[in-house]
Amino acid sequence: MQKLSFRQGLAQILNLLLVLSSAYMGYKTLSFVTDCESPVVVVLSESMEPSFQRGDLLFLDNRNPSFDEAKVPSVFEKIIYGSPVGIGDIVVYSLPDRPIPIVHRVVKLYESENQTHLITKGDNNKIDDVAMFPKSINYLDRENHILGVVRGYFPYLGMITIWLTDYPILKYIMLGGLGLLTLIQKEEQ
């Protein structure tokens, strides 16, 4: 087994920092472009089956344009500027007393004084979400509660994060495997 020189060790650390900072910058760029604090979320429950399964990775967009009512926006405008939330859209929202975001479909929509108010429901649930809301909230407010609108998904890719959360030993096995891989890779060079 060959010992790494100081320069080789430093180069490895800098390469690792470059990869991590690039991933972080990519995520932050995606956050900026989609106007979402968290543009990627994982479905954690079965409440949206059959539309989404537990472990699906969802991609969100939170751009809320105001189109001229007389003009129907083109497909291009909807892609570039986003589109308003409508009945049937799947949104991700958070409530003040719940740290984990909820993924549900919009079933009722109210417009008042230039604000959009929503009522949501999981596809696999029998009743809407009003019962989950704190007493001070009667509906979801687009500006204060909605984190984003689902624009795409990747099936089951989020199961990795669920497994790492449910079984913490997997984190240590994965980190140990990565460390071992690094040692083996250096031995071969």
Curated annotation (Swiss-Prot):
Q: List the disulfide bonds.
A: none
Give the keywords, sorted.
Endoplasmic reticulum, Glycoprotein, Hydrolase, Membrane, Protease, Signal-anchor, Transmembrane, Transmembrane helix
Membrane topology recorded in Swiss-Prot or TrEMBL: Single-pass type II membrane protein
Record field: transmembrane: 9-25
Tell me the InterPro entries matching this sequence.
Answer: LexA/Signal_pep-like_sf (IPR036286), Peptidase_S26 (IPR019533), Peptidase_S26B (IPR001733)
Active site feature: 47, 104, 129
The enzyme's main class, written as a single word, is hydrolase
- Native species: Schizosaccharomyces pombe (strain 972 / ATCC 24843)
Q: How does it assemble?
A: Component of the signal peptidase complex (SPC) composed of a catalytic subunit sec11 and three accessory subunits spc1, spc2 and spc3. The complex induces a local thinning of the ER membrane which is used to measure the length of the signal peptide (SP) h-region of protein substrates. This ensures the selectivity of the complex towards h-regions shorter than 18-20 amino acids. SPC associates with the translocon complex.
Biological processes per GO annotation: signal peptide processing
Main function: Catalytic component of the signal peptidase complex (SPC) which catalyzes the cleavage of N-terminal signal sequences from nascent proteins as they are translocated into the lumen of the endoplasmic reticulum. Specifically cleaves N-terminal signal peptides that contain a hydrophobic alpha-helix (h-region) shorter than 18-20 amino acids.
Q: Which GO terms describe its molecular function?
A: peptidase activity; serine-type endopeptidase activity
Q: What is its main location?
A: endoplasmic reticulum
Alphabetical GO CC annotations of the entry are: endoplasmic reticulum; signal peptidase complex
Write down the EC number. Answer: 3.4.21.89
Parts of the chain on the Cytoplasmic side? 1-8
- Annotated compartments: Endoplasmic reticulum membrane
Glycosylation sites noted in the Swiss-Prot or TrEMBL record: 114
What name goes with this protein?
Answer: Signal peptidase complex catalytic subunit sec11
Reproduce the free-text note on domains from the UniProt record.
Answer: The C-terminal short (CTS) helix is essential for catalytic activity. It may be accommodated as a transmembrane helix in the thinned membrane environment of the complex, similarly to the signal peptide in the complex substrates.
What chemistry does it catalyse, as a reaction equation?
Cleavage of hydrophobic, N-terminal signal or leader sequences from secreted and periplasmic proteins
Q: Which residues lie on this side of the membrane: Lumenal?
A: 26-189
Q: Which family does it belong to?
A: Belongs to the peptidase S26B family.
